[in-house]
């Protein structure tokens, strides 16, 4: 069995896309984030796999993420690395392969996600590099917590540091195409047409 893990922030005014909100305002930032959530949801449903949705703050029972398609969870941990580690640990209890994505990459496609899962047949890890030096996706076919430890999240060192850890483990990794996340107004202008 394969599992897609999706990390989202609860869509609340003033709490999402804060860097984007600096130039477009909180309401527009929330509106953009909701579009990204809708895009991510449709993409996830198009795949044949288990889907585990992890909310940042609280599980929302009656939102538009259907309980039929998504197993709902709350993120746990002191930083992003710990939260991802805990999500992978849970997913890999029942799955042979798991891949995690966030909800701010509108360039992500079904084909890229299918390639991510397929590549885990013969490789231990798969990573989708983001243009900002982080990643929009990471996947593994066994639980390896060390790849999430001692990393300065939301910096340009995330990807190189993660690759260094995988090399140290002497494991095989595949890199997917480099895509951009939507963090600021410039990013939004580049991808807005994909969500119209």
Predicted regions and their residues:
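Conserved donor-nucleotide/metal-binding helix-loop-beta segment in metal-dependent transferases, i.e.
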Residues: 106-135
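Conserved alpha/beta core of the MobA/IspD/sugar-nucleotide pyrophosphorylase nucleotidyltransferase superfamily
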Residues: 164-196
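A short, N-terminal amphipathic alpha-helix
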Residues: 31-49
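Short, glycine-/small-residue-rich phosphate/pyrophosphate-handling segment
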Residues: 144-165
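Short aromatic-hydrophobic micro-motifs that form the base-stacking/packing surface
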Residues: 99-101
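Short phosphate-binding loop-to-helix
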Residues: 65-97, 155-158, 186
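Acidic donor-binding segment of Leloir-type glycosyltransferases
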Residues: 46-71
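N-terminal nucleotide-binding beta1-loop-alpha1 segment
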Residues: 1-19
